[in-house]
Amino acid sequence: MAQTQADTAARKPVGQSVSATRRVSRLRRHARLRKKIAGTPERPRLVVNRSARHIHVQLVNDENGTTVAAASSIEDDVRSLQGDKKARSVRVGQLIAERAKAAGIDSVVFDRGGYTYGGRIAALADAARENGLQF
């Protein structure tokens, strides 16, 4: 019994890769979160962006669409730090807290970017809190 091309196409699994599914899920979580929070000049949004190797954080004023302060694990003083990615995330949290204080900001709205609150995200948030930022 010969298979037709339609039969062969019907048997192929349809779907996305696991990484694509995770990325889409994260973007959906972030969209839900963004509907609820917004940054103001007095209380900007602390946005976290994580990659496999680095972590970036920004203080964003959504009314103007401007970045008030930023910190990243790509910076030289963080790159030279010995330790794992979590230790670098802690240092980035300390840097953003220092830069927020220098800009006159004491309180922020935390935007975890759709990432689960744990690991590097939690380490960054805890370090920022310990250095004086109010969430």
Swiss-Prot record:
GO MF assignments: 5S rRNA binding; structural constituent of ribosome
Protein's GO biological process: translation
One Pfam assignment: Ribosomal_L18p
Key words, A-Z: Ribonucleoprotein, Ribosomal protein, RNA-binding, rRNA-binding
GO cellular component: cytosolic large ribosomal subunit
Gene3D superfamilies per the UniProt record, alphabetical: 3.30.420.100
Region Disordered, residue ranges: 1-23
Family annotation (InterPro entries): Ribosomal_uL18_bac-type, Ribosomal_uL18_bac/euk
Entry's family note: Belongs to the universal ribosomal protein uL18 family.
Annotated function: This is one of the proteins that bind and probably mediate the attachment of the 5S RNA into the large ribosomal subunit, where it forms part of the central protuberance.
Subunit structure, as described in the record: Part of the 50S ribosomal subunit; part of the 5S rRNA/L5/L18/L25 subcomplex. Contacts the 5S and 23S rRNAs.
Record PANTHER family: 39S RIBOSOMAL PROTEIN L18, MITOCHONDRIAL (PTHR12899), LARGE RIBOSOMAL SUBUNIT PROTEIN UL18M (PTHR12899:SF3)
Entry-linked NCBIfam families: L18_bact
Name of this chain's protein: Large ribosomal subunit protein uL18
Species name: Mycolicibacterium paratuberculosis (strain ATCC BAA-968 / K-10)
